Amino acid sequence: CSWRGHRPDMEKVLTLIAPRGALSPDHLAKAAAALRAAGGEAGAMQPLSEAEAADLPFGGLPLDVADRAVRDALAGQPVDAIAQDVIGRRKRLLIADMDSTMVTSETLDELAGEAGLKEEISAITRRAMNGELDFEGALRERVGMLKGLALEALERTWATTELMPGAEELVATMRAHGARCALVSGGFTFFTGRVAEKLGFHEHHSNTLLHEAGRLTGQVGDPILGRNAKLVTLKRLAGEEGLDLAETLAVGDGANDLDMLGAAGLGVAFKAKPIVAAAARARVDHADLRALLFAQGYRAEAFRRVV
């Protein structure tokens, strides 16, 4: 690896990321001290973005031990820490969830608001995303409750849907460096198509809301894209690109993302449900989606935005 300050014995890197302006020298000092206290070596800090992100090269510790040591040392601070090998940290395939990941809301819950059912449907969504309910059954149940809703409600829901901060930079920067970018969601094509177009994803895969005479029928097209389908899509796209799974990045927040996150080279639980954050190898709880670029070693000045 050619990055500045790299030493052969520092074959791993810890990336510290915080909301803009919130990363302090004290955070970096505590992280380095935690690595040394755990029995590792820490090198010189490499800034990625002023008061937002920095790389800390290290060696002599397994990744999970380093992660845990630094998280414990920074507990209660608004700082995310991601430890990984230096070699191969830049990924060539991005697979991203949509709801509460690429957009700030759960689009089905917002659509339910148009039918006056947001509270009831949100409760089911919450349980499904926490892994308490079967995803497919929960999806059919929620869509069934929307039978008869006019299609104009979809347009109104889209008009108020907001992109997650950092989503534009993530997709545009990875695309500019040759990565294939796919949006894979248990949500619906009406929304994934629009999000994919707005952010510049190469493709999108999701479920279809069936409708007739301008109204929802309360049914979902088969087959349903759920937890296993996300994993299958990750493996299929990696195969099409001739990539090892180690060269892939997946990001999501719900229980139906767990298999995909576990299989990707870097699987990131983004502001995720507790069951997901606990199981994922990497997690982002405080920063925005720019964190996924910093984790790959990109400096802020190299970020792109959708043109």
Q: What spans do the regions from the language model cover?
A:
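C-terminal cap/substrate-recognition subdomain and adjoining C-terminal extension
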Residues: 148, 155-307
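Exposed alpha-helical structural elements
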Residues: 30, 65, 69, 120-123, ...
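Alpha-helical substrate-recognition element adjacent to the catalytic core
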Residues: 15, 40-60, 83-89, 101-209, ...
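Asp-based phosphoryl-transfer active-site loop
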Residues: 92-107, 256, 261
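A generic alpha-helix structural signal
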Residues: 32, 67-71, 125, 158, ...
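Non-catalytic pre-domain segments flanking phosphatase-related domains
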Residues: 6-96, 304-307
